[in-house]
Amino acid sequence: MSKAIKILLPLLLFSLSLQAERIKDIANIVGVRDNQLIGYGLVVGLNGTGDKTTSKFTMQSIANMLESVNVKIDADDIKSKNVAAVMVTAKLPPFSRQGDKVDVLVSSIGDAKSLEGGTLILTPLTGVDGRIYATSQGAISIGGKNERGGGVNHPLAGMLYGGAIIEREIPLDLYSKTGATLSLKSSNFQNAARVQESLNQNFGTQVAIAIDPRTIKLQRPESMSMVEFLARVEEVEIDYNRENKIVIDERTGTVVAGVGVKVGPVVVTHGEITIKITPEMSADNGAMDMGEGIKLSLNTNTLSTSGQTPTVSSVARALQRMGATPKDVISILEAIKRSGAISADLEIL
């Protein structure tokens, strides 16, 4: 016996959502970006929760560290459990100057039980070119406690807030430049054309030209510095054409969809579940309220919207309340998408 679920609503038209957005929120300036840094170090001062003595690379690292301070010892003779080998990562923001501080993430790579209470000893951080750009040292912050067990949430990774000092700058000269390039965060011909049009109208002259659906070349006016020009560019607003997207976390069943993602007329059967979206209206006064403007008729197993237009999120939540598993919800939404009743991209995590 199949279980019929009918979602009743008026017929609707689909369109991409338009909203005003600043250029700084939808585009990046090419070359102005973070750079990744990485290093290998040791965390000391652990209360017996460090790497085991069988971790040879840790014991060898301890021996090498001690030798750097004129203490010579064979790695095989080290029996300490208060030290852990870690990878240290950080992001070097654009225009960082010597002496600036950045946050650091420290992660265990051995068999340590916890980094809580430990101190990272001086660790150089290098870029992809192998050059040292920062150094890091300091006490590790693990974070909050687990409410259920009372222990640390994830004791094998921690932060050093402001724990790295910039030693080398990455040169980026804007002062002498006469041009720059904008890169839209998503490719779209309409958005690229709107950015070009809005900028040229705002400045009263041609300062922008779109060369593809993602890239806009800029030419600063002679009367402005590059910093002043880019600051003004970033504040210009356009009617941004935002494409609808549905994101589903398969592990948790979480469905995230924009408010404009609607469901059109369709009939989908998945196992014992049948979804029918039709333009007719239902008049069942005894229906159970499922939330999100959707009601369930106990007599006919029918979901109705009482004249409202359902969204993907409201349909998914109604299915979950009826006992559909995350896999069922994903399969149903995929089928609806293939039928053309959802004008949005579907992304499964």
Swiss-Prot record:
Any Gene Ontology CC annotation: bacterial-type flagellum basal body, distal rod, P ring
Segments passing through the bilayer: none
Subcellular location: Periplasm; Bacterial flagellum basal body
Signal peptide bounds: 1-20
Keywords: Bacterial flagellum, Periplasm, Signal
Complex and partners: The basal body constitutes a major portion of the flagellar organelle and consists of four rings (L,P,S, and M) mounted on a central rod.
Function field: Assembles around the rod to form the L-ring and probably protects the motor/basal body from shearing forces during rotation.
Family of the protein in this entry: Belongs to the FlgI family.
Protein name: Flagellar P-ring protein
Protein source organism: Wolinella succinogenes (strain ATCC 29543 / DSM 1740 / CCUG 13145 / JCM 31913 / LMG 7466 / NCTC 11488 / FDC 602W) (Vibrio succinogenes)
Gene: flgI
